[in-house]
Amino acid sequence: LALSLSDTVYQSYTGTDNFEDRQIKNIRALASVYPNAVQLVTLAESDIKSIVDLKGKRVSVGAPGSGTELNVRALLEANGISYGDFEPQRLNFNETADAIRDGDIDAGFWSVGPPTSSILNLAATRDIRLISLSSEEVANAQNEVAVFAPYELAAGMYDGMEEAVQTIGIPNVLVVNADMDEELAYKLTRLLFENTDE
């Protein structure tokens, strides 16, 4: 059993992107467990209103090789934006929040299940704004990565967030070996669905 982002599972199963020349055909997704949401955060007084406004700015794209960085790169490239268009900073979640708070960067990305503790903490100390994606930007991302899906961050999720924010979500899936016994797969799936409230 493993828990993985579905884009990574898709790449490994199809032998594409990071899994070129090392395809893994004997895996199956047993269930979608919860979604990560790409969250782009800046300070409320920032002039950044869309992903296009990131050009020329200092932007955290997540820790090197992280799911955040992979998701962000795919999202931006699908919308004609490359790392050469801004100053990418490879910071983890807490470092990103601290750097936004201290004015060391202009914006930062998170790809994680919301609400996110580091964003909650940042919103408690500074006025922040989450940046919405346009419907076209979401569609462009979906065309690039089959497992990307529209996702809405609910109004009020973070202090000062008065409106819902449109973004993309990436399911985290429970991955198993293709040879897993069918009865065991059934029992695991039943256990998950019978305990969703827990």
PLM-predicted stretches and their roles:
Residues S6, T16-D17, S46, S82-V175, ...:
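Pocket-lining segment of extracytoplasmic ligand-binding domains
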Residues L1-A63, L130:
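Short, glycine-/small- and polar/acidic-enriched structural segments
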Residues I51, P64, T68-E69, R73-N79, ...:
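Acidic/His-rich structured neighborhood in mature extracellular/periplasmic domains
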Residues G56-S60, Q89, L188:
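Short, well-ordered beta-strand elements
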Residues R22, N79-G84:
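Short helix-capping segments at alpha-helix termini
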